[in-house]
C-alpha cells in the first residue's frame, strides 16, 4: 500500500496543468479598457457576490481610509483620488474575495489526493477557499492530513532546532501581510537568529534591484507617481500595463496628454500600450481611446539587449 501511495505522489506535477480552452480568433484590439471593462467587471461581480456586496467593498478600495487592492502593486496618488480608484482587475479580485466563503476542511482533504489537487488549476484552488487548520503530508501518504496547532508547532520546531545554523532557514512570507502579523513574524525570526526574511516582492524585483544598486546606488525605484505627469519620455520594456497593472494606463494617459513621448519595446503589440479608453471619461466610455505610444519597437525575442546597447 505504501508503494502505491508513493507512486501516486510521484505523478503529482509541481507545474500547473496545461489546458487550452476558450480560444478565440479575431482582429487584435487597438486599445484597452472603456465600456467593455466596466461591463465585464459588473458581470463578474453579479456572478460572484452580487452587485451590492461588491459595490460595498469597492467604496474603500485604494482610498486613504480604505484598503489596498490585492490585484497589483501600483501606487496610490498622494493627493486627489478618484471615487473609483481601481481597475477592472481590482474590481474582479475584490468581488471574488468578498464572495468566497468556502473552506478547505478535513472532509476536503479526505476527498482530494495530492495527485488530484496537482491536476487542478490555480483558479480552481482559489475557489476552494481558505485553510481552516494546519495540514501535513506524511511520508508515503497520498493525502494531506489535518493536525492541531500544537502538533504543527512541534513539527516546525523540530525541523528548525535540527539545523546546524539559523541561517540555513528561510522564512518566506507575503508582502501583503498586515503590519501586526509581520512584526510578530520578523521578531520570531530574529530571535531565532537569522534575518533571512524574503517575501513575494523579492521574486518580482530581485533582478531589477540587483541592476539598480550598482547603477544608481539603491535597489529601488527613485520616482514617484507624480513624476509620470512631468516626464518628457517614458520607456516601457517587455510588459503590458493593461494586463499587469491597468491603473498605470491612467498615468500614461496624463503623461501623453502633457506631451510625453512613450516608447514601448515588446515583440508583441499589446492593446494596452497602443491606446487607452478611460472608463471614467465620457469619451472613454464611447470607445474614443487616447493613443499612448509614440513609438512601438517590435524587437525580436531577446532583442532588447541589443537595443539597449545601441542606445548607450
Per-segment meaning from a language model:
Residues 2-312:
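Catalytic alpha/large subunits of respiratory electron-transfer oxidoreductases
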